[in-house]
């Protein structure tokens, strides 16, 4: 199957890692739906993606809302007629130590990071199973494997992503659908850029490659797992962390 001309939905793709993933797919000729809770930013990103010579559409999406998720997939079916790739990238953090964490902060992170991936995957599989082809790539985190103080909700949500991924892989391999996860480590973002230099240097000491990752380091892994070339890879977690976790 040709990669060029396929249709991808990338959640949380108005900026950051999600935007880089969308751009990476578009550079391969994939049509991309930009879905994000921030529609204004999504529209800007979609315009940039369309400038790469592919079709692109921006949709508002709160992934924790089953109604909004269903509406987005109906829109994709109506406007594109198919869906080949789903990247569950939408996610948030609400940090706090276990004893200080509010229940609503636990629920919010689980609902967006894990329930959102569940809802989107469920709708995607309905389409992909009929096509007998599909690629689902979920964004996990090194925190799912190493833990991180102050992120009990985030770590639990990303560990759940790994279990979700492996189960989907087993359930739908016979339908030509693969499901894999990418687990980023410390990635250079506006937040990490703002850290004091001494803090950044301490963080780098935990990374054998002695640098932070870039959004394109993550995007490149996602693009490969989204491609027809990855057809014999399913149920796997690809770690993109410079050797911080092995």
Predicted regions and their residues:
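Active-site helix of classical SDR
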Residues: 121, 157, 165
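Canonical Rossmann dinucleotide-binding motif of NAD(H)/NADP(H)-dependent dehydrogenases/reductases
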Residues: 2-33, 168
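C-terminal helical subdomain
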Residues: 181, 204-229, 233, 242
């Amino acid at each position: 199957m040709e990669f060029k001309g396929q249709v991808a939905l990338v959640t949380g793709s108005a900026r950051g890692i999600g935007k880089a993933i969308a751009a990476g797919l578009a550079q391969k000729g994939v049509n991309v739906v930009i879905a994000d809770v921030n529609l204004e930013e999504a529209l800007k990103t979609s315009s940039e993606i369309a400038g790469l010579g592919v079709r692109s559409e921006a949709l508002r999406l709160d992934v924790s809302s089953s109604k909004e998720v269903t509406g987005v997939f109906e829109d994709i079916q109506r406007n594109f007629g198919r869906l080949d790739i789903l990247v569950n990238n939408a996610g948030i953090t609400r940090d706090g130590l276990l004893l200080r964490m509010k229940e609503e902060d636990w629920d919010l992170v689980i609902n967006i990071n894990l329930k959102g991936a569940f809802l989107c995957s469920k709708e995607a599989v309905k389409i992909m199973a009929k096509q007998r082809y599909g690629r689902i790539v979920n964004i996990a985190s090194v925190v799912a494997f190493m833990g991180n103080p102050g992120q009990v909700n985030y770590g639990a949500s990303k560990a759940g992503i790994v279990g979700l991924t492996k189960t989907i892989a087993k359930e739908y391999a016979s339908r030509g659908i693969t499901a894999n996860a990418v687990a980023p480590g410390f990635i250079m973002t506006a937040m990490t850029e703002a850290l004091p230099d001494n803090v950044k240097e301490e963080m780098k000491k935990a990374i054998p490659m002695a640098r932070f990752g870039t959004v394109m380091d993550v995007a490149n892994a996602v693009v490969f797992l989204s491609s027809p070339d990855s057809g014999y890879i399913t149920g796997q977690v690809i770690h993109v962390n410079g050797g911080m976790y092995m």
